[in-house]
Amino acid sequence: MRHTWRWFGPVDKVTVQDAAQAGAEGIVSALHHITTGDVWPVDEITKRHEAIKAGGLYWDVVESVPVSEDIKTQTGDWKNHIANWQETLRRLSASGIRTVCYNFMPVLDWTRTDLRWETRHGARAMRFDLTDFAAFDIHILKRPDAKADYPDWLLEEAAKRFAEMPDTKIAALGRNIGAGLPGSADGYTLAQLLEKLRSYHGINRGRLQQNLIDFLSEVTPVAEEVGINICAHGDDPPWPLLGLPRILSTEADYAHMLSQVDSRANGVTLCTGSLGARADNDLPFIAGRFADRIHFVHLRNVTRDTDTVPCSFFEDEHLEGGTDMVAVIAALITEEARRRAEGRDDHTIPMRPDHGQEILDDLTRGAQPGYPAIGRLKGLAELRGIERTLSHGRFGLATGKG
């Protein structure tokens, strides 16, 4: 695999040079300052390439070209936004980009209730607490009919939790849940979030699935034409939130998407942390089943409080948690060997250590939530060690790698 590192641009407190020192071979980045739905300007794409080269690395993967809410709901200026997405692919390809990640989560991107939860050894990790989330939905956001989405026991727990919740915790929940895309300055107030939720009235799971297929039917031919692999990131967490449907949460969801637009250019961002929040997602099996269409990998682990769906969980160390990371990496390097033997030019799959706990100096550095320097360095080193061991000519898998 090609070891990459997410960089949020010049505002990122973790530099490209830091990434290189951590062992990264390439950078994952995006133009977060460009308004969602607009075409990415050529000069801005060039500036990002140059900024990354100045740090000693190259821009390997775009994460993400955001998909607008207009496209997801097929309202407003959605057709023009699709045309702009297509043109952005053309411009990225002309600059040398070959992999573009995106997601189709409605309204909210990845959602956590606590961005700096203290672990058993004093590190800080991101956590999704189901009771806190229900308390937010019912008692803080006050979403109409929210109570119908939760079982009686959780309604009771959420009411009790909210009654004991200090004002600082109430404010923090609103900030954490209403945050926008990672790297983006955008976010929602409670009123704005309720308004966004209303825009999905009448859009059920089947309708949102079809809107995704309609989007892919338009952009995949352009991706094929310009030599880019587009890859869908899963829902995080992988179940409905705030009454909104989610459509990339399971093996079956991905199978549907890939079969409906059956092109190698239409592929998967395999995020083990996102899908791993569900106990019924067998990540090594999923990695093997969709291996031919995996274009980008996020390796992350979570520990669930229970095996129910939904559940509470936290982002554990990369080799801890519920996902067998050794088995996942074995499936990926086996696929790389198969592609190499087939002569595919995309035989090396870009991977990044997804998120990381705040440890050591991370605790005072103040990086983007989930993206500390030392926590990710540790994760990348551990993952690299597994890959090197499995790829060893004498002791590892027969990968055919020279």
Curated annotation (Swiss-Prot):
EC number(s) stated in the UniProt entry for this protein: 4.2.1.8
Main EC class the enzyme belongs to: lyase
An example Gene Ontology molecular-function term: mannonate dehydratase activity
Recorded catalytic activity of this chain's protein: D-mannonate = 2-dehydro-3-deoxy-D-gluconate + H2O
One Pfam assignment: UxuA
Pathway stated in the Swiss-Prot or TrEMBL entry: Carbohydrate metabolism; pentose and glucuronate interconversion
GO biological process: D-glucuronate catabolic process
Keywords tagged on the record: Iron, Lyase, Manganese
Function noted in UniProt: Catalyzes the dehydration of D-mannonate.
PANTHER family: MANNONATE DEHYDRATASE (PTHR30387:SF2)
Family classification: Belongs to the mannonate dehydratase family.
Name recorded for this polypeptide: Mannonate dehydratase 1
Gene: uxuA1
